[in-house]
Amino acid sequence: MNTILPCQDQYFVGGQSYNCPYSTTTSESSVDVSTETWVSFWAAGLLDNRELQQAPQAQESFSDSNFPLPDLCSWEEAQLSSQLYRNKQLQDTLVQKEEELARLHEENNHLRQYLNSALVKCLEEKAKKLLSSDEFSKAYGKFRKGKRKSKEQRYSPAEIPHPKNAKRNLSSEFANCEEQAGPPVDPWVLQTLGLKDLDTIDDTSSANYSALASHPRRVASTFSQFPDDAVDYKNIPREDMPIDYRGDRTTPLHSTATHGEDFHILSQLSNPPVGLKTLPYYTAHVSPNKTEMAFSTSLSPHCNVKTHSFHQGQAFVRRDEEGGWKFTWVPKQS
């Protein structure tokens, strides 16, 4: 069977030139093609034509995809650069840690040499001797016993300190030591003088002058009881005399006033001599809880003197130029 194979057939090559491996002209004697050979060759030509047609379509679909090739390369380069930078940081950290480790090893070697030195061994021997001694054990035992005791057990009830009252008690002890013993003053004396105590004036109450206001005749009759003696102004006590708490009595001075002059003698003493303070007297029928006699006289425009007479003595209260009060107590002397 003689056959001519058309190599330019478009069914085999898709419309393109195709180099046929066989010659275009054959003879029966040179080529013998069976039916099976013809079918296999025809199927191979069909497959080659399909592959050539699918290749341009694949290139077009790849070019039309959502990830273009230049953008993909730039993203990969950015990821690679970040990884390289991270790797460089880790390498620097590793170098620093290695240097620090080497320094620690060196310090450790120096410490070992110091511990193996003779000085440290000598100190260890001394410490062992001290710990093994009996004195240290006794002292440590006392310290442990003292530490177990509470603060309440360390002090007795009388020895427990009171920081709040310590200063107050100390000041009271000093005050008791500084005070001098003296006879007490009756409360009615202080009330009559208008004083709270010997050093404080009571501004709320005034001196008791009820005896002078309610019994003028009694005062006048007292002057008339002594007609023979005269008043000695030179011997009258002065305001600057010191206070004497002795309980002695003295004989009173007497006045030359008569019963007919009545109470006018007090009005005549408006401007007495400077040394005049009081006119003492004594009556047995006057109660000791009341003022026997008291009067006020002005020695100067800015100085007032008030005098009070009692069985125990005489009291003088004077206001000075600064506005304060001065108190003087003169007991009776025998």
Swiss-Prot record:
Its main location: nucleus. One of its GO terms (cellular component) is nucleus. GO terms for molecular function: chromatin binding. It comes from the Eukaryota. It is found in: Nucleus. Highly phosphorylated by CDK2; stimulates initiation of DNA replication. GO terms for biological process: cerebrospinal fluid circulation; cilium assembly; DNA replication; multi-ciliated epithelial cell differentiation; multicellular organism growth; negative regulation of cell cycle; regulation of DNA-templated DNA replication initiation; seminiferous tubule development. Residues 143-167 are annotated as: Disordered. Keywords: Cell cycle, Coiled coil, DNA replication, Nucleus, Phosphoprotein. The keyword Ribosomal protein does not apply. CDD domains: GemC1_CC. Residues 82-119 form a coiled coil. PANTHER family: GEMININ (PTHR13372), GEMININ COILED-COIL DOMAIN-CONTAINING PROTEIN 1 (PTHR13372:SF2). Regulator of DNA replication. Promotes initiation of chromosomal DNA replication by mediating TOPBP1- and CDK2-dependent recruitment of CDC45L onto replication origins. Belongs to the GEMC1 family. This is Geminin coiled-coil domain-containing protein 1. It comes from Homo sapiens.
